[in-house]
Amino acid sequence: MSLKEQLEHLQQKSLQDIQKVVDLDALNQIRVEVLGKKGPITEVLRGMRDLSNEERPKVGAFANEIKSDLAQAIEARKAELEAKKEAAQLAHETIDVTLPGQPVKKGTPHVLTQVIDDLEDLFIGMGYQVVAGFEVEDEKHNFEMLNMPADHPARDMQDTFYITKDTLMRTHMSPNEARDLESHDFANGPIKMISPGRVYRRDTDDATHSHQFYQMEGQVIDKNITMADLKGTLEYTIHHIFGEDRDLRFRPSYFPFTEPSVEVDISCFRCNGEGCSVCKQTGWIEVLGAGMTHPNVLKAGGVDPEVYGGFAFGLGIDRFAMLKYGVDDIRNFYLNDVRFLNQFTQEV
């Protein structure tokens, strides 16, 4: 039998074997046995050394053609077997689309987000704009424009997270008020803005202090603004958050960016003003600070204090949430304990 006849015989036998296999492993074994370096085709081709120079290239070309045909046959059979395997798997894993699906669990806003959203909705309803600002601030807007000179204790490295000599993590939300004063055109109307967000202090974390917490500050700048406007705004806000039955008390205080300044207390939730351990026997709980915008702050923002005046206020979102919901440790807001957070679920 000539080499060509041997190759034709191997081709026919291999094609029959390829069609007989029923799984991919057996097909791969045929591929190795037939087309591998130790396969029968290679063995037959070793006899080419006995051929004449004229016959050798013809037989070699014929052998390569057979190898190509067998490789194509193997790939075609592989595709058939893979299709059958996939069809069998799909038939086995048939899904009844008429079955009821499992309900998707809804998320819910974090309790601090709920308080922020509530306050934003309240002030937007009163015509205020919400300003976000920058968490990394410069000394000019965080201190200088707010009537806090270089020797002010709040600018000490022990109280503030400095990033560079002149940049820092904002210690309050007041820089946004300073930037608003700088850029505002009173031809478009007065300033009425609130600014909620994260602030940073060099505090040791404990039940009532945190190195990072949420504040909301606001300001109104216009002609003929009085302390009565501030008082009415804060009374409306506190009654909205804590209930109409809360009494308010305004105490004189000091803040560098307001004059006069006040701190606002509400009657104690537990004792209703009678005195207990929660209010330290005073009957009152401090909730925020406020005051009339200091003339130096107006001047720093390019606003004439002889023409315009205003008020500003600042409150702790975390503190509001603690008082409203009776939370005794500020750290609970940041531990992501689902058992704690599930107490404040809200439909969205």
Curated annotation (Swiss-Prot):
Keywords: Aminoacyl-tRNA synthetase, ATP-binding, Cytoplasm, Ligase, Magnesium, Metal-binding, Nucleotide-binding, Protein biosynthesis
UniProt-annotated binding residues for Mg(2+): 259
Protein name: Phenylalanine--tRNA ligase alpha subunit
Cited Pfam families: Phe_tRNA-synt_N, tRNA-synt_2d
Cofactor: Mg(2+)
Superkingdom of origin: Bacteria
Family, per entry: Belongs to the class-II aminoacyl-tRNA synthetase family. Phe-tRNA synthetase alpha subunit type 1 subfamily.
